[in-house]
Design a protein with these regions (language model features):
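Carbohydrate-active catalytic/glycan-binding domains of CAZyme proteins
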Residues: 1-130
Length: 130
């Protein structure tokens, strides 16, 4: 994207296996071999999602039911299922994304308000670019 390489990865929000939400993160680099930036937040409940661009140029990420379903309104409030939790009620959800070069770097974010911010249980602190 632009002149940068973007590496996507996933992790549980509590940095513990199947605890919290399974999220999508990313890092950027000038060369494919790195060094890469610190981990940045890309989307909540998008873990193991596939990021792709459609024929019209819109970016998307697949999201899956991965854990106990909690309604998005409840998950945003910080409801703790005590185990893996997800707001994806169906087997597959397509979430619109924004991926763009900004000031020599890349900004990735989910456009759906339910997916765009880390939850209250997120162990890592992020500065979110809106």
């Amino acid at each position: 994207v632009g002149n940068k390489y973007v590496l996507f990865g996933t992790a549980w929000s509590r940095d513990s296996l199947r605890k919290g939400t399974y999220n999508l993160y990313y890092a950027t680099a000038d060369k494919i071999e790195g060094p890469y930036s610190d981990r940045r937040f890309a989307g909540r409940c998008l873990g193991h999602g596939t990021v792709f661009r459609d024929k019209k140029g819109q970016w998307w990420c697949t999201a899956f039911l991965n854990g106990k379903y909690i309604a998005p309104e409840e998950l945003v409030k910080g409801v703790d299922a005590g185990t893996a939790s997800s707001m994806n009620q169906q087997g597959l959800t397509l979430v619109p994304m924004s991926i763009e070069a900004v000031n020599g770097d890349v900004v990735v974010r989910a456009l759906d308000p339910h997916y765009c911010l880390p939850g209250t249980e997120e162990m890592q602190q992020f500065t979110i670019t809106q």
